[in-house]
């Protein structure tokens, strides 16, 4: 039984999908005005792992993650570059998808764009106005009335009188006052940048409405899992939930899952500190496996720190896991033994049990290390039980698949066999120079 922490209830709950055997999951995607940083990469990995876990436990999954391709930042960048908003958005969408591929994430099944859902967004806003949950200012802007939804605050767990001042401006661009300082924009009138016709005049939609409509259009009025970074709980997810409550009388998703933030050398990553790490640069430097291992080494609800120390620790841990897997494969091949038919089901089940417990990756890593320890013990015996060792190896590789980490075991050739024989002969003859040279060649080939 998979259990997930639900931000809405503040509890770890048994997971029961709406439709037996199938899961609908939506994760908020990026506003595409710049390249993805490592903070953007964390939810890519977290929810990719969750999807893999759900599938390993027998569910089919429809995974949707959007692109916000209309926004003031996109418009400003297009103006600076003398190009179109569409060209700016497409450039960063392409780059974002490349990061996903570089991270070995399974691409979402559906990646809707705001600009492709404008008719539905306008219709949704119009319904909110007619339902009395939204109002139109004299300047033609449309705002959602947070006081019209008694449950407002159920995601962030804040009452209206407890919310931080400044979470939403009191006055809009035209100077018309809001009825409540926390009312948020559904539609903004503008004469700048890309805009659409609406019942209230030409303008653009507010951010919070876009995701609700894309969920409804692609998955329906209620889904199983809504995911995203912790920073989206308020106001974005709170405001999504409020709009859905207003029109469809539900909170959009049964499980609200949020990952914590990424720090750089113990400090919050921010443009002002100049410590932004671009995701593609990280993958290029560390590689896919090490990046994913580091990100998953910390529970997804705890802050993740990127530093030289945490990278070094992750690299040592990866070596501790990968080397025995390679050695087990090489020694089996040298002995002329076929691969085992199955895997160690008990070890794999222990790993899944940890992952099923709110994706407890630290405990799951402990299972990996324990299984690797057994592989090492098996390889140190005089007469290796290759069947047992190989089942352990295959169970670890299945664990790593859920973490999105790939294992490429070396294939031993006839030339490799001769080199191993030469190494052993040199050691037996105490010809240390020849032995060292043979060992170096074996290491270069990834066989030691």
Residue ranges with predicted function:
Residues 1-33, 48, 119-329:
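Alpha-helical recognition segments enriched in aromatics with Gly/Pro capping
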Residues 268, 277-448:
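Structural preference for alpha-helix termini/caps and helix-kink/transition segments
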Residues 92, 116-120, 364:
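An acidic site on a long C-lobe helix of protein kinase domains
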Residues 9-12, 18-106:
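N-terminal, positively charged nucleic-acid-binding surface of large information/translation enzymes
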Residues 79-85, 109-115, 229:
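The substrate-binding groove and active-site-proximal loops of carbohydrate-active enzymes
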Residues 98-132:
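N-terminal, positively charged, Ser/Thr/Ala/Gly-biased leader segments
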Residues 55, 101, 129-130, 257, ...:
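Alpha-helix C-terminal capping/helix-coil junction sites
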Residues 59, 133, 447:
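Short phosphate-binding/catalytic loops that engage adenosine nucleotides
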């Amino acid at each position: 039984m998979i259990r997930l922490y639900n931000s809405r209830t503040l509890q770890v709950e048994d997971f029961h999908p709406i439709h037996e055997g199938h899961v609908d999951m939506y994760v908020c995607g990026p506003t595409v005005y710049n390249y993805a940083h490592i903070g953007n990469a964390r939810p890519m990995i977290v929810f990719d792992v969750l999807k893999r876990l759900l599938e390993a436990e027998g569910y089919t999954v429809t995974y949707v993650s959007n692109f916000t391709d209309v926004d003031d930042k996109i418009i400003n960048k297009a103006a600076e570059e003398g190009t179109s908003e569409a060209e700016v958005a497409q450039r960063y969408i392409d780059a974002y998808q490349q990061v996903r591929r570089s991270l070995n994430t399974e691409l979402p099944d559906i990646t809707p764009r705001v600009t492709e859902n404008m008719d539905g967004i306008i219709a949704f806003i119009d319904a909110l106005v007619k339902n009395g949950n939204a109002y139109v200012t004299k300047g033609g802007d449309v705002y959602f009335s947070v006081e019209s939804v008694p449950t407002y605050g159920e995601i962030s767990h804040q009452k209206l009188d407890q919310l931080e001042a400044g979470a939403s401006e009191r006055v809009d661009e035209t100077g018309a006052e809001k009825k409540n300082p926390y009312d948020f924009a559904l539609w903004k009138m503008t004469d700048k940048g890309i805009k659409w016709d609406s019942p209230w005049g030409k303008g653009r939609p507010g951010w919070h409405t876009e995701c609700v409509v894309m969920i409804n259009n692609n998955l329906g009025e209620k889904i199983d899992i809504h995911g995203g970074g912790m920073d989206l709980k308020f106001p974005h997810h709170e405001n999504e939930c409020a709009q859905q409550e207003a029109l469809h009388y539900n909170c959009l998703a049964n499980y609200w899952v949020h990952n914590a933030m990424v720090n750089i050398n113990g400090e919050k990553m921010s443009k002002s500190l100049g410590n932004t790490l671009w995701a593609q640069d990280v993958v290029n430097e560390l590689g896919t496996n090490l990046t994913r291992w580091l990100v998953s080494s910390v529970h997804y609800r705890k802050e993740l720190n990127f530093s030289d120390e945490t990278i070094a620790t992750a690299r040592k841990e990866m070596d501790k896991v990968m080397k025995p897997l390679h050695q087990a494969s090489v020694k089996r091949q040298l002995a002329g033994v076929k691969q085992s038919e199955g895997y160690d089901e008990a070890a794999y089940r222990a790993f899944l049990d940890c992952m099923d417990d709110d994706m407890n990756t630290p405990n799951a890593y402990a299972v990996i290390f324990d299984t690797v320890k057994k592989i090492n013990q098996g390889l140190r015996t005089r007469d290796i039980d290759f069947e047992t060792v190989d089942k352990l190896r295959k169970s670890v590789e299945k664990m790593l698949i859920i973490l999105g980490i790939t294992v490429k075991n070396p294939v031993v050739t006839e030339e490799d066999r001769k080199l191993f024989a030469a190494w052993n002969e040199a050691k037996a003859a105490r010809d240390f120079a020849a032995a060292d040279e043979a060992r170096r060649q074996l290491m270069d080939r990834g066989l030691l």
